[in-house]
Structure formats: C-alpha cells, structure tokens
Swiss-Prot record:
It comes from the Bacteria. InterPro entries: Fuc/Ara_isomerase_C, Fuc_iso_dom3_sf, Fuc_isomerase_C, Fucose_iso_dom1_sf, Fucose_iso_N1, Fucose_isomerase, Fucose_isomerase_dom2_sf, Fucose_isomerase_N/cen_sf. It is found in: Cytoplasm. Mn(2+) binds at E335, D359, H525. The keyword Cytoplasm applies. This is L-fucose isomerase. SUPFAM superfamilies: FucI/AraA C-terminal domain-like, FucI/AraA N-terminal and middle domains. It catalyses: L-fucose = L-fuculose. Its main location: cytoplasm. GO terms for cellular component: cytoplasm. Belongs to the L-fucose isomerase family.
C-alpha cells in the first residue's frame, strides 16, 4: 500500500544539559505538537483524509538526534520538514540536510530565549550549504508561556505545508500521454527531462489505438458500461446540432457514438489508474494501469478525423462525479498539452478542487464590446475581459453551480452534494461536435460559468536555455447580460463551454491592462482554478526551482526560501530567476 506523503516536524533545542535543555523540553515539544495539530486539523489530501505529520522521536540538540530524526522520516514517507524552536540551538548540527525535499524553520519570537537568533543562524547555514529553507518568524513578541500560534505564523506554516505536500504527491507518479503531439502544439511535445528533474515524475505513453483495441476485445467492465449508458440517457442532455445539414449524423449513428464515448471515458480512466475488475475479467496486465497522476489525450487530428472526439471523456474525467457517484476528479489535459496538464496539477494539489482547461481565446476591449453589442462594460468588466473557451470539453464543476454561503464555488468532492451534481447537469448540454473540426463526430460540452467567482489562471511554459517558467493571473469570472453573452459567444463556437474572465490589474508590467495580460500570456492554453492561490503557487514554484515570470500577487504575500533574499531584495522577479538558475531543479 502506498503511504500518503507526510510532513516531518523537528523540535530543536539548546543542547546544554544541567538546567538549560531540561527547562525547554516541554515548551519545545509542545511547539512541534501544535504545528502538527494545526496542519492535520486544517489540510486534507486529495482523497479527503487529514494530512499526517510525523514528529521527531525526541527534541534535537545534537547531531545524533538529528540523524535519528532523519532515519525516522526516511521510513515514514516524509516529503518536507518543519523545524520549530523557542530558543538557541546549534545551527548546522541540528539542521536537516536532505537536499531533495523542502525545509522550513519557525523560530519563536520571544525575549526569554533567542529563537530568532537560531533561526537566523541556521538559515545562514542552509544558504551556505545550498539547501534552501523557508524562515518563519512571528511579527509580534510572544510570552514564553504562550502556546498559541500567531495568525501570521499560521498563514506561512499552512502555505508552506500545502506547497510541500504538492511536491510529495507528485513524486514517483507518472504523466501518461495518450497519443502524441496534437497539431504541433508545443505543450504536447512532452519533455521527460522536465518531468523527471523538476517534478520527480516519469513519463509513459500509449498509442490511441489502445482505445480501439480495448473496445474491440472487450477490455472494459461490461456491467459498468450498461449502468453508465442508462445513467447518461437519464441525466445527460444532448444539445442542439449546429452542423450544416449534410454533416448531421443519423439518430442511429449518434446513439452508437454515445456508446463509443462512454467506453472512451472508462478506458481513459482505466489507463490512468487501473481497474481491479479487469483482472476478474482475465485482463491482469490492463488492470494495473499506469500510476498516472495526470494524463493527456492527443485527439486532433489523427483520432478526431476518424473517430468521435474525446470531449465527453475529458469532461467527465475532470469532473467530480459520474454514474458511480461523487468522487475526486482526475487531472486530464486536452490535446495532450502536458504543460497545461502540469499547470492544472499544481492548482489541483494546492486546492483539492477540479480544474478548468481553456483556450485563452480572445481579449474583448470595452470599445469592441460596445461596437458589437451596444453595451457599455461596467464593474469588474469595465477594463475588458478574456474569453476562456476550450474546444469542446471542460469540467462540469466549472459551471459554478456548486455553492458555499450562497455564492458559486468549485469545491472539493467531499463537500459536494447530489443537488449540486444535478444543478451542474441541468445547466450543461452536450451538442454533437462541430464536424468541420471533428470529422469523426462526438459530443462537446456547453455551459456558461457563473460570474463573481475568484479564480486564478496559470500556465507553465518551457523556455529554451532557462527551463520551465510559471505565469499567474488572479481575477474573477464575469456574468454578462444574457444578450451580450450570446452575441459574443456565438462569434466563436456556440457548442463549447465559456468562461468570461477579468484579471486583477495592478497598473504595471503585464498587468497594466487586460490587453497586456493577453499579450504576455505564454501559450494558447491556461489552467483555471477556484480561489486566489497565486501566493501558494509562487511558494510551490520556488520549491521546484521554477521562476515566476508574471503574476499579480501582492508583494507582502510572497513567501519563498530565505536565501532568495540573498540574490537581491529590490527586484524580486530577477532574484527569483537567479536563485532558480543557480540551485537547479529539485530532483536533479
């Protein structure tokens, strides 16, 4: 059984016996317990289980105790450490020197013992040794007897833990390419060095003929298929056929295609994670799956010119429910865009919520909207907006039909209820695919995302000579007047899922205007997640040594390892590039 990755908590202490160490034992160990309690009571794994922490077997005052802690952590699948102390300790003697996992240190801000002095000393040792560590130091002085974790310290501990867990969850998993390069898209030219060295992942690949092989040979669960077909007929609405008359398929052919795309979903899922039912049917090898945390399907054009497209498969893999009930989503990239798949994966592991995959299709200026519709933009839309629309697939959670406190959200599967599932289905239809694009047919996904949701759009790009770089745009979804929406939406493909997005502007750099955001976006795709998580993404990127080339996160929310400041404190973007370049990938 594969263990969850855990956070290791290291209570370090002044090693001097005969009074000093003894007086600090309880306080120091209680700090460790309080951090473990905070993390386990606040954060969850993608399966909904509380995050697990492992505390060192004793306080750490000298090297043998540091070594004992290290041995325990190796056996316990610890993916990151947090060192805590209220006092002076011996810096390089007590530090964790594992170079391939993240480290953080919380030095208690008190006057009785110099926790801050240890923090500064051990962070200097980390910098000297080239092992980055995050420094956490409360803004306000606390009493020595105060066991509460200050709010600013909590925020940093949780931000660090979320990002560190993401590194652990990715490690030793796989990206599965179903097919190869789609239409010359750079992101679907999968780079195994990037996955191995930055994420600790491997790459696997299957030809798209694996889908037809499994269909022809019955390598899927026939009982599940019958149940799925019944559920789809009862719950999934076929949309209006926008094709010209000579391209409209017969009712009989459409019915056959519904059966085909349901099988595609089942096979795509089984390829990613396996299915023990296949072993019962005599297909032991296929039952294992590919241990894929994220996958992509090429589709265009070799598949879609001949077979029904992958829109239904992609939509329901990225959605948190199907005929088997509510479940955690998969992370699945259209057009095998592995870089957008990784962008979705970063978002998912930080939030435990499903992800919107979209083309960053159009910038609509206020002037253009008024010319086309006669409507003057206002509110969050006043400076213009971006049309985010994928060519036929999107998680149904992207409808925004789930709610929290009466507001539209995308939330973890364990918070979802059946009424929200039905609302998503009722507000979505599945039109026959545009056969000028998809000659083999299939069914696309059509909905409109509800407005006023805080979201973050993310994209990972590869830059020759530099490596991966990350860009982040926080903003809000918009709800336009119905007639304005229809006028703008019908200028593209009315059978595809639409999200109207207004990035938050800062007045400088790439965020001077919405046009500048569009103009500086590094690729044709973006991954959109619920919530403003840019600060968490910046922390995660620093752990992986991926520089951030564009973001609109307030400077006070940026949390990177302490030694980043030694690369410069005025121009943080340049310092980030220098630090990542010098330190190199986390897993190299």
């Amino acid at each position: 059984m594969i263990q969850h990755p855990r956070i290791g908590i290291r209570p370090t202490i002044d090693g001097r016996r005969q009074g000093v160490r003894e007086s600090l034992e309880v306080q120091t160990m209680n700090m460790a317990k309080s951090v473990a309690d905070l993390i386990s009571s606040t954060l969850k794994y993608p399966d909904g289980e509380p995050v697990e922490c492992v505390i060192s077997p004793s306080t750490i005052g000298r090297v043998p105790e540091a070594a004992a802690s290290h041995e325990l952590f190796k056996k316990s699948n610890v993916c990151a450490t947090i060192t805590v102390t209220p006092c002076w300790c011996y810096g390089s003697e007590t530090m964790d020197m594992s170079p391939d996992i993240p480290h953080a240190i919380w030095g208690f801000n008190g006057t009785e013992r110099p926790g801050a002095v240890y923090l500064a000393a051990v962070l200097a040792s980390h910098a000297q040794k080239g092992i980055p560590a995050f420094g956490i130091y409360g803004r306000d002085v606390q009493e020595a007897s105060d066991t509460a974790i200050p709010e600013d310290v909590k925020e940093k501990l949780l931000r660090y833990a979320r990002a560190a867990l993401a590194t652990g969850l990715m490690r030793d998993t796989a990206y599965l390419s179903m097919g190869s390069v789609s239409m010359g898209i750079g992101g679907s030219i999968v780079n195994p060095d990037f996955f191995q060295e930055y994420l600790g992942m491997r790459n696997e690949s299957v030809d798209m003929t694996e889908f037809t092989r499994r269909m022809d040979r019955g390598i899927y669960d026939p009982e599940e298929f019958e149940r799925a077909l019944k559920w789809v007929k009862e719950n999934v609405k076929e949309g209006f056929d926008h094709n010209r008359e000579d391209l409209v398929l017969s009712r009989e052919e459409k019915d056959r295609q519904w059966e085909f795309v349901i099988k595609m979903f089942m096979i795509g899922r089984d390829l990613m994670v396996g299915n023990p039912r296949l072993a019962e049917l005599g297909f032991e090898e296929e039952a294992v799956g590919h241990h894929a945390l994220v996958a992509g399907f090429q589709g265009q054009r070799q598949w879609t010119d001949h077979f029904p497209n992958g829109d239904f498969m992609e939509t329901f893999l990225n959605t948190q429910f199907d005929w088997n009930g509510i479940r955690k989503p998969f992370v699945f990239a259209t057009e095998n865009d592995s870089l957008n798949g990784v962008s979705m994966l970063f978002n998912y592991l930080l939030t435990n919520t499903p992800q919107i995959f979209a083309d960053v299709r159009t910038y609509w200026s206020p002037e253009a909207v008024e010319r086309v519709t006669g409507y003057t933009l206002e509110g969050r839309a006043a400076a213009g907006f971006l049309h985010l629309i994928n060519s036929g697939s999107c998680t149904l959670d992207g409808t925004g039909q789930a709610t929290r406190d009466g507001k539209p959200v995308m939330k973890p599967f364990w918070e979802l209820d059946e009424s929200e599932v039905q609302a998503m289905l009722e507000n979505t239809d599945f039109p026959p695919a545009n056969r000028e694009y998809f000659r083999g047919g299939g069914f696309s996904t059509r909905f409109l995302t509800k407005g006023d949701m805080p979201v973050t759009m993310v994209r990972l790009n590869l830059l020759k000579g530099v490596g991966p770089v990350l860009q982040i745009a926080e903003g809000y979804t918009l709800e336009l007047p119905e007639d304005v929406h229809h006028t703008l939406d019908n200028r593209t493909d009315p059978g595809w899922p639409t999200t109207w997005f207004a990035p938050r502007l800062t007045g400088k750099g790439a965020f001077k205007s919405v046009y500048d955001v569009m103009n500086n976006w590094g690729a044709n795709h973006g991954a959109i997640t619920y919530g403003h998580i840019g600060a968490d993404l910046i922390t995660l990127a620093s752990m992986l040594r991926i520089p951030v080339n564009m973001h609109n996160v307030p400077e006070e929310d940026i949390f990177r390892p302490k030694n980043w400041s030694l690369f410069g404190t005025e121009d943080l973007e340049s310092a980030d590039y220098r630090a990542c370049q010098l330190l190199g990938p986390l897993h190299k």
